[in-house]
Amino acid sequence: MLRSRILVAVVGIPIGLAAIILGGYFILGLAVILTVLGMHEYYTLLRPYKPNLLVGYLAALAVVVGAYFLGLPGLLAGLAALVILSFFWSLFGELGAHLVGRMAVTHFGTLWVAAGFAYIILLRDLNHGMGLTILVLACTILNDTFAYFVGRA
């Protein structure tokens, strides 16, 4: 497990730093890739709860891409799209048991994964945003590293 973490860090940190420094479409591309990977991992773990994958992935991409092109209003428009798509799903899609629970699992994935990457995009666009975004990346890496080693102790 530690080997895979080191490998991801050796490859991922330079890619993340490059995307943050270059900004623009580089950070958008990385955010989209990481959002799709994060959503896949989240929905794989919660497969027994049957989230709506189409609604979740579409809304997640709308949140990240909307944040890049339109700022905070774009992020909010993506979240609104999530709610609207979910209501259409509940009206015209599969009904069945636990629909509200399935919608909740779908919504939470978008909020947890996609909104996080959208905020990274928004943070990068602020004054001194590159430094702030690198600080957030460093804090996240340190937090994950310490949690891993403390959890193993």
What are these regions (language model features)?
Residues 2-153:
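Membrane-embedded alpha-helical bundles of polytopic integral membrane proteins
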